[in-house]
């Protein structure tokens, strides 16, 4: 079956209101979709297979931004019921894409760490084939949350928006069910045992 023939269903925001560790594991293999305008003015949808996530499970998680229970303008959206975006800037240059998960008043989210492009406009795919640095379908090209958001043109304008096609970023399920492995989280040495 060709990629264009695969039947996908859009995940509703309520899908993200489940336990965060379950959501993080279930997101592996799902398809993150991004609607953009191509350089020729045409609308396109990039589809990226999610290959790596990290769960941040609230006030008891030393690596979570809301671990101390302190609500700030930046973390306020994490207290929302699952199904909205939490995007923040780190090191002043990298946007981090998080999907708020779990119930209301429980500040939890799933960081999308890595993925690879599986479908996009033919024009974009052809441009990528000409320049190895632009090959978004290469397994390592969107490896790392900063590379991922840069490649998909995601920034803080997405903060607080629902995870739906109306936001121009959404998640689909096309039936892919890869094996999932659990590993320590990356880049949170400050959280010691919370890795």
Ranges and model annotations:
Residues 2-195:
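Conserved, well-structured core segments that form or line functional sites
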């Amino acid at each position: 079956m060709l990629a264009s023939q695969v039947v996908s269903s859009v995940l509703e925001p309520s899908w993200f209101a489940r336990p965060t560790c379950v959501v993080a594991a279930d997101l592996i293999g799902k398809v993150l979709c991004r609607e953009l305008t191509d350089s020729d003015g045409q609308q396109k949808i990039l589809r990226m297979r999610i290959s790596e996530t990290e769960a941040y499970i609230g006030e008891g998680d030393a690596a979570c931004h809301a671990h101390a229970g302190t609500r700030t303008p930046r973390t306020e959206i994490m207290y929302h019921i699952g199904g909205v975006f939490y995007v923040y800037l780190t090191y002043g240059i990298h946007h981090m894409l998080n999907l708020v998960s779990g119930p209301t008043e429980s500040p939890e989210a799933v960081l999308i760490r890595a993925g690879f492009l599986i479908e996009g406009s033919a024009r974009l795919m052809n441009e990528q084939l000409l320049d190895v640095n632009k090959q978004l379908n290469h397994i390592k090209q969107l490896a790392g949350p900063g590379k991922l958001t840069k490649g998909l043109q995601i920034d803080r304008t997405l903060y607080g928006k629902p995870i739906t096609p109306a936001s121009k970023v959404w998640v689909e399920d096309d039936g892919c069910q890869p094996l999932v492995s659990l590993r320590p989280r990356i880049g949170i040495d400050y959280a010691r045992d919370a890795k």
